[in-house]
Amino acid sequence: VVGDDFQSIYSWRGADFRNILNFEKDYKNTTIIKLEQNYRSTKSILDAAQSIIEKNVQRSDKKLWTEAGEGKPVSIVQVLNERAESEAIVRRVQNAVDARYRRYQDFAVLYRTNAQSRVIEEAMIRYGVPYRIVGGQRFYDRKEIKDIMAYLRLLYQPNDRVSFERIVNVPTRGIGTTSVQKFVNWQEANGMTLQDALDKVSECSELTAKARNNLNELGDILRSLRELVDETTLPGLLDSLLRRIDYMNFLDDKTPQGESRQENVKELVSVTQNYQDLGLDGFLEEMALISDADSVDYGNNAVTLMTLHAAKGLEFPVVFMTGLEETILPHSRARYD
């Protein structure tokens, strides 16, 4: 049996570091062979890792060593918040590239949860630093973010058919594709706006009673939220939207993926705090610009952004570990492990 109690990143797949720690108890007369030589990292990196893992209450007694030399010291940078952290990373990357000391592809930025990539991506875009995301989607390409942005666009542009067709069944309302097409055909044939058609959908005989009722409820939600656009703050509007459609509960499927989607939506809520003065129209315009810049393909010479899980087994000349704070890294769940 081969295992390492110092690594346990796949607990959601059933992995548990205690399986290795308890192996001698479960199987008597076991011979333990410690593999302590590290062939990849320098001594400074191993020392930093060892100083952290030594704080584990439950762990095996082993000391990693290497013949790779001392290496450059691990640098610890303390900043005010995640925005300052992202800008510090971008500046270091750009300075090294400008000095022709490194290429963009030499750098990797690691984070614990996918939601953390948003502020890093925006910093990269602001400063014109090429980047790519490995093992995941760019923040504004994630389904849950696209869903909420579609709702916001529909509040601002009541006749945005593309956004309407995206959100009409999100969360699930039991309105099928055929019903949506019948509704749109009826709306266009009668020369109505989408909101007027939703308000008068009871007159659409082509639809079932259930579909008419569900579309009418959606119309009520959109109308009431649209009335808030000029009366509340952008974060307040988004909060009202999430509560009216019960979106967070819709995402809560009791899986790590569901939790990640919820974290992404919470991150979007935090984004709106930075655009309160712009209003909904200004916010949507800014997000469109970011999304356009976000879609550029930079090829291989780009900074790599990825989660710690996705980075397993990979090597980079320069690595930034972000979000080293309680409840993020270590994650809030780690306190119960």
Annotated model-derived regions:
Residues 1-22, 35-41, 241:
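Conserved helicase NTPase motor core
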Residues 2, 45, 89, 109, ...:
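A residue-level signal for conserved active-site and pocket-lining positions in enzyme catalytic cores
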Residues 3-4, 111, 322:
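Active-site flanking residues adjacent to catalytic metal/cofactor-binding acidic residues
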Residues 6-13, 40-41, 133-156, 168:
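Short alpha-helix plus adjacent loop in nuclease-associated cores
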Residues 8-11, 41-47, 54-55, 61-62, ...:
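Switch/connector loops and helix/strand junctions flanking conserved nucleotide-binding motifs
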Residues 9-13, 33, 77, 334-337:
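Flexible beta-alpha connector loops of hexameric P-loop NTPases
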Residues 28-31, 36-130, 153-157, 212, ...:
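Helicase P-loop NTPase motor core
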Residues 117-129, 142, 149-337:
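Conserved helicase C-terminal RecA-like lobe
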